[in-house]
Amino acid sequence: MKCKRCTTSEGCLVSRNETFCGECFSRFVLLKFRKQMMMDEYCQQVFKVLYADKHRTAVEADEQNKRSVVLVPLSLGSSSLAMLDLLNQTLSEQRAAHNRTGFQVKVVLCGFSADMDELKRLAESLQTERLAMNSDCIKLYLLDLDRSFSTCEIHKLLLANDNHGSRKIATRENATLSSILDQFSRRSSRDDMLWFARQHLIKKFASQHQVKVIMWGHSVTRLADEVMSLVIKGRGAQIAATLDSTGMDVEYGALFKNLYPLRDVLLSEIDAYCSLSKLQRYIYNYSLQGSLFIKSQDEAAQANRAVPMAKNMTINELTRQYFDAVEKDYSNVISTIVRTASKLDYPISNGTEVIYCSICNNRVYVDPSKWLKSITVNNCHPPASDEDMSMLQMWESSSKGKETLARNQARSNIWSTAAEAPLCYGCVVTLNETKDRELNWPSREHDVSQVLAEFTLTDEE
């Protein structure tokens, strides 16, 4: 079967009911990527090569090209790796056409201490083998997630037992991100907290390094998954901010934009691109899908892939499983979800003061504690008989009762001196599942530059 684009080469895969050869398909993905890169005037000024004109001199144009810095959060999954490869192609084409480039790229690779050696090996291979031609304008940084939180101020967040109010106190306890995540019993909550921590560090790095655009490697499948997951978790108010690619990120000083250049590309298409571009050897902790290829080379692997039990899956994994099932035949379902969600506006706040959640750093529009208090019974039923009173006194005199009463009294004493710690509804629900409704969580105000600098990969290493 011939490729429908060039009509000369043999087709190797089918996507969106169209047959592609490898070269035409790679071009198809590249064009969708470029379209999002140049979506508005701001992005055009960041990505294109600037020359002297009536607005700037040649020296000013060169300086602006150097100051056009974009940040790529790299997970070494298929999406972020494909995006970095497409960016590298763009830089190479600019260098060939203009003998210069229009922007600089900073790449941040986050991982836990146990994964650092393998991540560094893959990053060094990627830098020397795939990015060597543009090594002067692509710099890679490794960030140890555990070490990044070991030096910052830690707050203990407390959730009230009776009215769902929240407070925070400073604590001298040392914490790594791994120990913070261990406070949660459910994988879904741990994944949420890991994403909030990773996102905060990336955006903090962007605000400290004059970054103009953060390029997130989310496919349209991942974005649809994220939209549905936010609704399920009670975080629907965050959808508008999550998908906003036009406004500046006000939570971090309105210094940069968040861009999703692969938002028109399906995850299966990104996986196919990685296979065609021979990026498999750089992928970490992810298996490529081969569902689009006419002669799939990994049919056996796909057939033997273990399907986890639903009760062991996170909310994101459950929604991803659904979208994986419908992506091939009903891809319009996925794009419709993202397109509809992109039309949502920011919620209207009840007050004039701008308040941010102490955990996820998203804006709080309505105080969830007041709403929860209005729909729940918050007080225990009092003893109704002498027998009830006798049983209560027996419990109070028991070791378990004394321990509980002492803990509640200590918590009450702390509560009276603790500071306000606003939480969004989703984080109230998450904090409610922790032991004693307490959570050690890092302060937003800390500098990640020192930790990043220690792991910067340079040409000499």
UniProtKB/Swiss-Prot annotation:
GO molecular function: nucleotidyltransferase activity; sulfurtransferase activity; tRNA binding
Pfam families per record: CTU2 (PF10288)
Keywords on record: Cytoplasm, tRNA processing
Gene3D superfamilies with a match to the protein in the record: HUPs (3.40.50.620)
Coiled-coil parts of chain: none
SUPFAM superfamilies in the cross-refs: Adenine nucleotide alpha hydrolases-like
Localisation per UniProt entry: Cytoplasm
Example GO BP: tRNA wobble position uridine thiolation
Pathway listed: tRNA modification; 5-methoxycarbonylmethyl-2-thiouridine-tRNA biosynthesis
Tagged with keyword Cytoplasm: yes
One GO location term (cellular component): cytosol
Family: Belongs to the CTU2/NCS2 family.
Function according to Swiss-Prot or TrEMBL: Plays a central role in 2-thiolation of mcm(5)S(2)U at tRNA wobble positions of tRNA(Lys), tRNA(Glu) and tRNA(Gln). May act by forming a heterodimer with NCS6 that ligates sulfur from thiocarboxylated URM1 onto the uridine of tRNAs at wobble position. Prior mcm(5) tRNA modification by the elongator complex is required for 2-thiolation. May also be involved in protein urmylation.
Name by which UniProt lists this protein: Cytoplasmic tRNA 2-thiolation protein 2
